[in-house]
A protein has these predicted regions:
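An amphipathic alpha-helix signature
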Residues: 44-48, 59, 89-92
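Residue-level signature of catalytic and energy-coupling elements of molecular machines
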Residues: 16, 69, 83
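Alpha-helical elements of Rossmann-like donor-binding domains used by nucleotide-donor carbohydrate transfer enzymes
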Residues: 4, 68, 94-98
Length: 129
């Protein structure tokens, strides 16, 4: 799927991946301009409730998942943004807002914008004369 992801990016499309911390850090090494958003639970209690609520894990697995999630939360500083996953619709909207802001980040397009105006400047100077 790596090729498919880069094909989408080459076409100018946003790609959203739901991945574990280890995968995110691997992507960050290969594609440093990627934007990383940490989706946090509203609270640790809610995190534990959600894990238990699935009803698919043993008590030992629940404890392991909870501890693993907590360890990942401690690495929040490796991400660019965070959101609290309270209400799905609100969380989705926050992610879309982050994507929109990133599209207007000067550091992403500084050279392209300057090149665009550089190409146009001579025509404008001619018109003014």
């Amino acid at each position: 799927p790596k090729k498919a992801i880069f094909d989408e990016l080459d076409m100018g499309r946003d790609v959203i991946l739901e991945i574990e911390m280890q995968g995110a850090m691997q992507i960050k090494e290969v594609y440093p301009q990627a934007v990383f958003i940490f989706v946090l639970p509203p609270s640790l209690q809610e995190l534990k409730n959600r894990i238990i609520g699935r009803g698919t894990e043993t008590e030992e697995q629940i404890e392991k998942r909870f501890n693993s999630a907590y360890d990942e939360i401690k690495l929040l500083g490796d991400y660019d943004y965070f959101i609290f996953n309270n209400i799905v619709e609100k969380s989705s909207e926050e992610i879309l807002n982050i994507l929109e802001v990133e599209k207007n980040k000067v550091s992403r397009y500084k050279k392209d914008i300057l090149d665009m105006f550089e190409k146009e400047i001579e025509n404008v100077k001619t018109i003014i004369k």
